[in-house]
Amino acid sequence: MQKYWREARSLLALAIPVIIAQIAQTAMGFVDTIMAGSVSATDMAAVAVGTSIWLPTILFGHGLLLALTPVIAQLNGAGKRPSIPHQISQGFWLVAGLSVLIIAVLYNAGHIISMMDNIDPLLADKAIGYLHAIMWGAPGYLCFQVLRGLCEGLSKTTPGMVIGFIGLLINIPVNYIFIYGKFGAPALGGVGCGVATASVYWIMYLLMHSYVARAPSLKDVRRPCTFEAADWATLRRLIAIGMPIALALFFEVTLFAVVALLVSPLGIVAVAGHQVALNFSSLMFVLPMSLGVAATIRVGYRLGQGSTDSARVSARTAIAVGMAMATCTAIFTIVLRKPIALLYNDDVQVLTMATHLMLLAALYQISDSVQVIGSGVLRGYKDTRSIFFITFIAYWLLGLPTGYLLALTNQITPAMGPSGFWIGFIIGLTSAAIMMALRIRWLQRQPKSWILQRAAR
């Protein structure tokens, strides 16, 4: 039992800085929305529309680079630290290719926006301007993620936390300058949020680069100053590990975007109640997601050491801690759902809808915790292809169709409205949790030599 307590402490030591860093990242989006809204409702809506396109696009690139964390953790555990700089160099080659792709998509995003029904021309122009500004921050964001992956793979999650908060603090005055046109800058309104965010991403990368270049503990894993050509064998391995993660993230983000679009014809009360419940549950999601990152690091490190038993302990402990935390957050949500909803809106109808949906959100928090931490464990085992298939089946083949039938049709029950989609979320997330748990159990029952050979890829 003692080994599980020790492992829990190690996991929490890694997860807490990730939680704080994620809160800082979320707060940047919140600040953008509030400051754009102070100019006009159109500017705020333009930032929201632009973000709905920016987010799945950049998270695809982010997901691909998540391959670096288990690779570096495994090399660190195996005592092969001299091989780490090569992986980082190839990570930057991935960034080069991803940046071209992402900028091309965002540059042409006007075609996507023009397909939206009855969109206001001014809103569309501002949303396109926002995307054309923020797209130049994509290389900076992705370069930051490469170095963050290096640090996290070496069990150093604090730098990402510190720099994330510095980024948040810088974002506020830079937003002020470009939104309102201060100190000689043009007043860009919502478009200024894109300029500010792009600038902040580059600053965050430069700060992380400075940390990596100066930290004594990273002296042996720094990249040499000499140019290193692309190594197609290494790039193929990283893409093979990262692509399923990228696609899984993309499908997850687009799922919630599709549900938001399907809810929108149901009226203002339905949309507002859905948004309140989704916003709060997204905040709660930060906790298990951060434990999932910690699980990836610990499992990868233990497999690098050649200890499948210790990797199993890390996996079990992460899931157990996550379930305990989810039980607490579920009780918190059930008991305090009305005061929490009042923080967002005091309209009686919206309040009633939001509190009902938050009750459903509380029901899936344990399942959500198991599936996201399970995904982190599978990343540690480098079993990422299964993550893609599980999330695709659970969300798009089970959760969304069931939610659609319950919410908008009378085929199973009389149309339930937004509640139907949330029951679909429960079904999808619970299915994902069960499949993740079964996959982990199957993996851990394989011969030790097979597990270690697979982890050393």
From Swiss-Prot:
It is a multi-pass membrane protein. Keywords: Antiport, Cell inner membrane, Cell membrane, Ion transport, Membrane, Sodium, Sodium transport, Transmembrane, Transmembrane helix, Transport. Belongs to the multi antimicrobial extrusion (MATE) (TC 2.A.66.1) family. MdtK subfamily. Pfam families: MatE. Multidrug efflux pump that functions probably as a Na(+)/drug antiporter. The keyword Ion transport applies. This is Multidrug resistance protein MdtK. One of its GO terms (biological process) is xenobiotic transmembrane transport. It comes from the Bacteria. The chain crosses the membrane at residues 11-31, 53-73, 93-113, 127-147, 160-180, 188-208, 239-259, 277-297, 316-336, 357-377, 387-407, 418-438. It comes from Edwardsiella ictaluri (strain 93-146). Its main location: membrane. HAMAP family: MdtK.
